Regions:
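Short glycine/threonine-rich loop-to-helix capping motif typified by GTGT followed
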Residues: 47, 147, 151, 243-249, ...
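Long, structured ligand/cofactor-binding scaffold of large enzymes
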Residues: 8-11, 15, 20-195, 581-633, ...
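Terminal amphipathic helices with adjacent charged low-complexity linkers/tails
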Residues: 42, 46, 51-60, 74, ...
Length: 753
């Protein structure tokens, strides 16, 4: 059975009472996000009005979801915890390791062959420890979770940054690193800084070519990629009624690009219908019984500014189709502005490839509406200029879409149907091009468009739009085509216009599938043996990191001073490196290879202070490690933006990098660094970043007095003999300092179990 029905019955039986107790304790009305948070305290007796954005709180999530690229490291850590089974319901989803090449029929068998060792490992660990296993081809983690596991009022963590997708069905769903997931899997408290609350007030109704994707693309332009850090975005207002559950999931999904802890929509009739249409009638009924507490209190809705830390106003009737990019998802541009903005910024204006899919936009409704645009091109005799690639969100969606003729609509205009997997969105794309370094443009319905992310080409200008707009621009072959106003030529030379997209929210004949690709947890598999070959280059058992030696860090060489955006893609690249996600030593060879060196403007080329030669970042780090020397990384704002991959924290730790000193951090990555026993420090004065020189030896003092709220001192010894000193700060609490001293959170847990 897929649903953990007894857990859900127990949860809903006590949920409303938990909320009532919370309101009585804090003595005020509650937002919906607060209700869910307070209902999931690890120790309900500790309930009090926590200081948002300041205090850390222990929670007890209902479940854990893991994708195959991050599950490897998470489960390798779990295996060291000495548990017989997971403490909460959990699932593994094989979606990241499948490469998009020529089509699903060939790509999926090839992936099963290439990744057999990893799939066998994940399957055996799942069976042994009572974890649900979704095999390759079953679908993208967040679409599968929405269809099968998400439930209003619940709390979930997932080892993927787009876990907040489930907020579309009313969950507090948070992306975390593997070590955080292990806390939940082993029944320990899960620690989170009490989020700030950003209320997003939706009025009006979407129309024409505007979609839910355009709502979040517009919000990204307002708040930027840092604007949601340590915050939950809670949506409210009469505009909610016109947005489907999958549309709401799209909006919550890309809240990750704001840096938000998560995003959430209240339970409503659309959510109830989605639960029923996906075979969860009992959950819909249980939620309906608790409906009053699955939304913000009336007093909050009447006077939202008194309860939210910030309010964003969005009139849906004024939302335009957007095309965000290139290179960052918050470069928001209404499509009507592209004719002027494109040439002014020297964008390549020919859209060569359109990619529809990803966890953000691969629902039945997404495909149905996008197919309505493709169908027009075929029926109106319009020659399609670009290449179109489709990744369905799950096998249930693919099977149903094929039955209903949706996939045929795409195929008729030459589209390639790829596997139900992430594919190009995570860099798993064998792009067929003669020159993968040339300047070009692609349009996607994905969530991220960092340089090199999709195809490895630093000169690919990637833009993000809705599935409908992606198909329209692929048909036109131009980034400045506005389907609301512009016309195209048919094969006879006549001007024709594309009508606004249409499509069913749910399949008229219902969802259908022959094989979901799921293996349910079973007590019968407890004796399954988990084997890791000692000579494997894909999997490697983990050795504990060394504890702190009690000394200050003196004369550390600067490994790299990064310039500009440094995401987890820059720190630990995906694409071809995904195959090493279960082997820490091998994947560490990609450390910071995408980061730009502030001293030469180049990537993966830094000075090795031992011999003065310029080498790859990992080569320099390994040279220092071999000599027993700790090193330090210096960075700018929002370091670690993007994916939840904890490899971006484990790799520097493995290569003896002890400190990341940045202007600011992205939430998930800062936590991951702390979990691995590293020091994530920030400049008190951001201008001190400019004092760091290439040949500096850097000391960090004050560690013996390391305490919550304390300052540490950095001293730079420059090559000319001069020095600079300045204070740095941190956000560590007592527990996190204990992790540092123990060498990692896992070491601390093992020592204190």
């Amino acid at each position: 059975m897929i649903l953990d029905i007894e857990m859900l019955r127990s949860f809903y039986a006590s949920y409303s009472e938990s909320v009532a107790q919370a309101k009585a304790t804090v003595k005020r009305p509650l937002t919906y996000a607060e209700k869910v948070l307070f209902a999931h305290l690890f120790d309900p007796t500790q309930l009090r009005p926590y200081k948002r954005g300041i205090e850390y709180v222990d929670f007890r999530p209902n479940r854990v979801a893991m994708q195959d690229a991050t599950a490897q490291m998470a489960l390798l850590q779990f295996m060291n915890a000495g548990k017989d089974k997971v403490a909460v319901p959990a699932s593994v989803h094989c979606d990241h390791l499948i490469r998009a090449d020529v089509g699903a029929n060939i790509d999926l068998p090839e992936a099963c062959k290439t990744n057999k060792e990893v799939y066998d490992f994940l399957k055996s660990v799942s069976q042994k420890y009572h974890i649900g296993f979704w095999g390759p081809g079953a679908g993208i983690i967040h679409q599968v979770v929405l269809e099968n596991y998400a439930f209003p009022g619940g709390m979930m963590v997932g080892t993927d940054s787009h876990t907040p997708n489930a907020g579309g069905l009313g969950m507090v769903a948070v992306g975390v690193g593997g070590a955080d997931a292990v806390d939940v899997l082993t029944g320990q408290p899960w620690e989170l800084k009490m989020p700030r609350l950003i209320g997003v007030h939706l009025t009006g109704k979407l129309s024409g070519w505007a979609t839910p994707k355009d709502v979040i693309l517009e919000i990204l332009g307002i708040l930027t990629v840092k604007g949601g850090t340590n915050a939950i975005l809670e949506y409210f207002g009469e505009g909610l009624d016109s947005i489907s559950t999958t549309g709401k999931a799209t909006i919550c999904n890309m809240g990750a690009e704001l840096g938000a802890t998560c995003s959430i929509f209240p339970f409503d009739q659309n959510a109830s219908e989605y639960l029923r249409k996906t075979g969860r009638e009992e959950i819909a009924s249980l939620a309906q019984q608790n409906a009053k507490e699955l939304r913000a209190d009336d007093e909050v809705l009447t006077n939202p500014s008194a309860f939210y830390d910030q309010i964003v106003e969005i009139d849906l009737s004024k939302v335009e189709p957007h095309l965000n990019g290139p290179f960052t998802p918050d470069a928001a541009t209404p499509i009507s502005h592209m004719k002027a903005k494109g040439p002014a910024n020297d964008y390549p204006m020919v859209g060569e490839v359109g990619l529809v899919g990803s966890c953000t936009n691969s629902s039945y409704q997404d495909l149905a509406r996008a197919a309505s645009v493709a169908r027009q091109a075929y029926e109106k005799g319009i020659e399609v200029k670009g290449q179109l690639i489709i990744n369905p969100g799950s096998e249930q969606i693919r099977y149903t879409a094929e039955r209903d003729g949706i996939l045929d609509d795409f195929k008729k205009i030459g589209a390639l149907i790829m596997t139900n997997a992430c594919g190009p969105c995570i860099g798993q794309w064998k792009r067929h091009t003669e020159d993968n370094t040339r300047k070009n443009a692609i349009v996607t319905s994905f969530n991220r468009n960092f340089r090199r992310r999709a195809d490895g080409n630093p000169n690919t200008f990637a833009f993000i739009g809705s599935p409908e707009l992606t198909v329209a621009l692929t048909i036109a072959g131009r980034l400045d085509f506005n389907p609301a106003t512009d016309t195209l030529l048919d094969k006879e030379g006549n001007s024709v216009k594309l009508d606004a997209p249409t499509g069913f929210t749910f399949p008229p004949k219902g969802f259908a599938v022959e094989d979901k690709g799921f293996i349910a947890p079973s007590e019968e598999n407890a004796n399954v043996e988990v084997v890791i070959a000692p000579d494997s280059n894909r999997l490697q058992k983990l050795a504990p990191f060394a504890p702190w030696d009690g000394k200050d860090l003196v004369d550390m060489p600067l490994l790299i001073k990064t310039e500009g955006k440094c995401t987890t893609d820059h720190i630990s690249m995906a694409g071809p490196w995904l195959k090493f996600r279960g082997h820490l030593q091998n994947i560490s060879d990609n450390l910071l290879m995408g980061a730009v060196n502030a001293f030469n403007g180049e990537s993966n080329k830094v000075k090795n202070q031992l011999d003065g030669n310029y080498v790859e970042v990992s080569t320099a780090a390994k040279a220092y490690k071999a000599q027993g020397i700790s090193s330090i990384v210096v960075a700018e704002d929002n370091y670690g933006e993007g994916s939840s991959r904890e490899h971006a924290a484990m790799e520097p730790r493995f290569l003896n990098v002890k400190v990341i000193l940045a202007k600011s951090f992205a939430r998930i990555h800062e936590t991951n660094l702390k979990k691995q026993g590293m020091l994530a420090l920030t400049f008190c004065n951001k201008d001190d970043y400019n004092k760091v020189q290439e040949d500096d030896r850097i000391s960090l003092t004050g560690l013996k007095e390391f305490a919550p709220g304390s300052k540490l001192t950095v001293t730079l010894k420059h090559k000319d003999g001069s020095e600079d000193s300045f204070e740095v700060e941190h956000t560590y609490n007592d527990t996190q300092i204990a992790w540092f001293k123990a060498g990692s959170a896992l070491n601390f847990a093992a020592k204190n179990k």
